[in-house]
Amino acid sequence: MLTIGDSRFSSRLFTGTGKFASADQMLAALAASGSQLVTLAMKRLDLKAGFDDILAPIRQSGVKLLPNTSGARNAKEAIFAAELAREVLGTSWVKLEIHPDPKYLMPDPIETFNAAKVLCERGFTVLPYVHADPVLCRNLESVGCAAVMPLGSPIGSNRGLETAAFLKIIIEQAKVPVVVDAGIGSPSQAMAAMEMGASAVLVNTAIAASRDPVKMALCFADAVVTGRKAYEAGLAQVHQRAIGTSPQQALTAFLSE
């Protein structure tokens, strides 16, 4: 079981809600994934209508909702979005996202840290989306973040774990869960993240943009479980030279008789 804040999860696959062809397709993929934590951008909700055709079915499914502050350009906007989510959705959980550059969607480390500090002081359960920066992740942990969410590669790029070397350092040092977020484009990449010791992965585009999102969600669910089992089993050590599986000396002794 994975514990984040005051909640426990049996599934280590977290999912997003964007880019699906329809709400029905999203719900079917969500069910297939087995995910128990789903992130949703506050900017996508129709709060004036009093009913949202995306939010309502997600709540009915029983999964935990993780509102995110995607679209916020600075700490002030992100804090406002988080407070709005707590008031409207009744949750103090927030995925903190601040990316002022609309082209590359790179998270702003300074504004993210400043917002995280304020939100933690106000009683939020903060999961910040950040660069794979070990120092930043340690600092975010120190101000009270419940988990850290370093990127594997840019959002929606499907380029995989380009930051693998830094993710390994973050995982080694962290005292809170590490959720690899952004850029995971295939089940094998999700498995690789889990094999290196990530607590969980968050996947959206790779599922939603696939030809069959429901089948792809099943594939990701299996990959995450397998990757976690491999990590717990302990991967064999990597060597730079060949190491035979049979004793060579015994063979040469036999031939010389």
From Swiss-Prot:
One of its GO terms (cellular component) is cytoplasm. 1-deoxy-D-xylulose 5-phosphate binds at residues 156, 182-183, 204-205. GO terms for molecular function: thiazole synthase activity. Transmembrane segments: none annotated. Its EC number is 2.8.1.10. Pathway: Cofactor biosynthesis; thiamine diphosphate biosynthesis. Keywords: Cytoplasm, Schiff base, Thiamine biosynthesis, Transferase. The active site is at residue 95. Homotetramer. Forms heterodimers with either ThiH or ThiS. Signal peptide: none annotated. Belongs to the ThiG family. Catalyzes the rearrangement of 1-deoxy-D-xylulose 5-phosphate (DXP) to produce the thiazole phosphate moiety of thiamine. Sulfur is provided by the thiocarboxylate moiety of the carrier protein ThiS. In vitro, sulfur can be provided by H(2)S. It holds the Pfam family ThiG. GO terms for biological process: thiamine diphosphate biosynthetic process. Gene3D superfamilies: Aldolase class I. This is Thiazole synthase. InterPro entries: Aldolase_TIM, Thiazole_synthase_ThiG, ThiG. It catalyses: [ThiS sulfur-carrier protein]-C-terminal-Gly-aminoethanethioate + 2-iminoacetate + 1-deoxy-D-xylulose 5-phosphate = [ThiS sulfur-carrier protein]-C-terminal Gly-Gly + 2-[(2R,5Z)-2-carboxy-4-methylthiazol-5(2H)-ylidene]ethyl phosphate + 2 H2O + H(+). It comes from Shewanella loihica (strain ATCC BAA-1088 / PV-4). It is found in: Cytoplasm.
